[in-house]
């Protein structure tokens, strides 16, 4: 991502990527949003006052705890409504969390609300695609750029990649090893690089990072749609 371009485009009220307008379209479930729209939406969030990646998200913790009580094979209407409310609260602080969007897609689908199911499925896939478009994750210089630590883990979970403990390779990049190497078109991959520079900016010297959980609980996987 070119930071100067992102700042210029998202702060200019005459730009098609003016941030308040992009966020309104995203929140309304606009299905006409393009890859470019999502690029400026996701990375432009780093320059919004609401972006506070180091703040604790107690609503996220609450949503995960509630999700762990849901019987995903035979959920009740009450448990799904409770889950949706909790996830929406958590999205206020982390509006692009793939795991939260995945939970919403599941919950709405289980309730028979196909419209909101598809909206959140599209949001999740678009966010994941935006991150993957920022690099290939195979080298420090082509690391995937993310806004929250959890987004990195969710991306790996979405591809069913089981990972080990991350290690720092530079001031802004970490390497996440895979427990089992995978073979792809790029060859044999042992792990991926993630750029956390947006998170590290203005980090207090005494701040201690806490790693988030990913969505791998109760065997809930990213849903697949035709």
List where the protein language model places each region.
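Boundary/linker segments of alpha-helical solenoid repeat arrays
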Residues: 98-99, 126-140
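Canonical positions in the second alpha-helix
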Residues: 89-90, 124
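N-terminal alpha-helical interaction modules that lie
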Residues: 1-80, 142-226
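TPR repeat positional signature
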Residues: 59, 87, 101-104
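TPR/TPR-like (Sel1-like) alpha-helical repeat modules
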Residues: 109-132
